[in-house]
Structure formats: C-alpha cells, structure tokens
Amino acid sequence: MLHRNPDEFLKSIPKDKRIMCLDMGEKQIGIAFSDKTQLIATAHSIYHRKNMSKDLGYLHRIFKENEAGSMVIGIPLNIDEQETKWCKTIIQFANKIIKKYKVNTYLQDESLSTSIATHTLKITGISITKSKKIDDKISACIILQRTLDKINTIK
C-alpha cells in the first residue's frame, strides 16, 4: 500500500525490521536503511539504473538481504508542497514495487535533501568530485532520517 500519512505508515511497519529508503534519480538511485529499532538511518549504496525489470529485481534483492519490512521513497515537492513533474514518475515506480512485491511504502518530501547532503560533504572536506559520487546515498539517508524522526514522535 502507498502511504502519504505518517500515522498510517507507522501502523503498517513490521516491528524489528529495517526500513529501506530510495532517493530516485533518472540515472541512479540512492539507497539507505534504518537499523532494526527504526531510529537511525544509514547510507547504504548507489544503484546505477538499467531498466525497469533489473531495477525492481535489484531493489527487491537488497530489500530482502537487509531484512527490510517497508520502504520510504523521496518525492520532490515544490516549495508550496505541490507535486513536481518528476513526482508522477516516482509514484508510478512506487506503485510497480507495491504491486510486484507487496511492500508498504511511504512517500516522504525530499525537498533540499541533495543540497543538505552536498553541503554536509563539503564541510567535512570531501571533494566535489567524490561528493557527486556519494551524495545520492547521503540524500536517501537524510530522507529516511526525516521519516524516522516523524514516526518516532508519533509512537
């Protein structure tokens, strides 16, 4: 099921399972996972997209390998919280994951997550060249931590 309400998503999350997060891009996907207590997000990897079938297969495999029970996908809302054109593509992708793998999925506003990731990497002394290679997984981590903070204030 696709959730937009954190209260509803919280009710659907299996306890003692990790939550997987995706920062969707046209060419690559940043991936992060929570710990099993669902308190802390950790950057995992960047997946370079190939085609829909391979993308879905890879994401499902690492979802299972990391013992995840639900998923968060970042969507880029405008400053007035309206959906952008890219949101439609992301929602279609999310619906394919849900239909094929029956994964409860929450859409989290990802506004400024890439800017925050890039700035964070810059102040830690990581070069711009290297930061461009890892900022998507850091963005996924930021998106997931926002969600974890939100659902843990509800608990």
Swiss-Prot record:
EC number(s) stated in the UniProt entry for this protein: 3.1.-.-
Record carries keyword Cytoplasm: yes
GO terms for MF: nuclease activity
Signal sequence bounds: none
One BP term from GO: rRNA 5'-end processing
Compartmental location: Cytoplasm
Single GO cellular component term: cytosol
SMART domains given in the database record: YqgFc
Function: Could be a nuclease involved in processing of the 5'-end of pre-16S rRNA.
Family: Belongs to the YqgF nuclease family.
HAMAP family the UniProt entry points to: Nuclease_YqgF
Protein name from the UniProt record: Putative pre-16S rRNA nuclease
